[in-house]
Amino acid sequence: MIPRHLAFPISAAVILFLPGSGSLYARQNGPQASDASTTWTAPDPATIPEGPLGDSIRLGLEVFNDTPKFAAPYVGNRMSCGHCHLKSGTAPYAIPVVGVPGLFPMYRDREKEVVTLEERIEQCFQRSESGHRLPNNSREMVGLVAYAQWLSKDQVTGRPFPGRGLAKLPELSGDANRGSHVYAQQCAVCHGPEGAGQPPSIPALWGPDAYSDGAGMNEIGKMAAFVQHNMPETNPGSLTPQQAYDVAAYVHSKPHQRFDIKEHK
């Protein structure tokens, strides 16, 4: 039996694997009609093999879902990978990690260099989890890569499928004042009136336990796309694009840890 904390949970709102300018597949892949040739079903955690490889995959899943607990030396807040890559990286339009190993090595404009999957994961720990780089041979890094590869085992490299990346929204201007009302009505019940969340299950949205200002989720457009399709968790997709932009602007206006690469080596 798979322990409960290894099951694919539905999380609440750190963008991890973010090639290109920010999100995993940016926002060019909005919701579309299902195509039998490109549909994908998440593998059952019960099928993770026994033995050393399976142990590494299971550790990677644990790190993914409760990063501060299972990768504590490398984390500087209370964010987990699964807070943005929902359902353990399997939820459509919640930046699923399936297929990610096949995208690397990749050239990234921000770094102006080709980076490996391990380097990209390190950047996520630095920016989204306000932490430090993991050694490539650490149990935690090997586990995360093993989990991503296992999750992608039935996905043809480079083949598109519905649900990748984030939902495509029109480009709008968010209003933090309007967003404060949306937040109070739709978000505060889970994330709290002061954005503190309920870690580890529900993430903080601002303050010392939330992502830094160097994280992908700190970009209003990306957060709006994530929120509109996935939140509130009890009624996802119920917010209009404008409401999503407004609440993203409100969260963006709140304090976040300042990201300085020199402090997160």
Language-model segments: which ranges?
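Post-cleavage N-terminal segment of exported redox proteins
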Residues: 2-63, 67, 105-177
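Extracytoplasmic electron-transfer domains, predominantly the class I c-type cytochrome c fold
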Residues: 35, 52-59, 63, 91-134, ...
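Sequence/structural segment immediately N-terminal to covalent heme-attachment motifs in c-type
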Residues: 52-90, 170-198, 220-222
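Surface-exposed patches in mature extracellular/periplasmic domains of secreted proteins
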Residues: 69-76, 132-137, 157-161, 235-238, ...
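Secretory-pathway/luminal and periplasmic proteins that interact with or process carbohydrate-rich
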Residues: 70-73, 88-94, 151-156, 198, ...
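Amphipathic alpha-helical interaction segments
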Residues: 79, 83, 139, 143-146, ...
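A structural motif
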Residues: 114-118, 148-160, 189-199, 216-223
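Short helix/strand-bridging catalytic loops that position acidic/His residues to coordinate divalent metals
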Residues: 165-171, 202-214
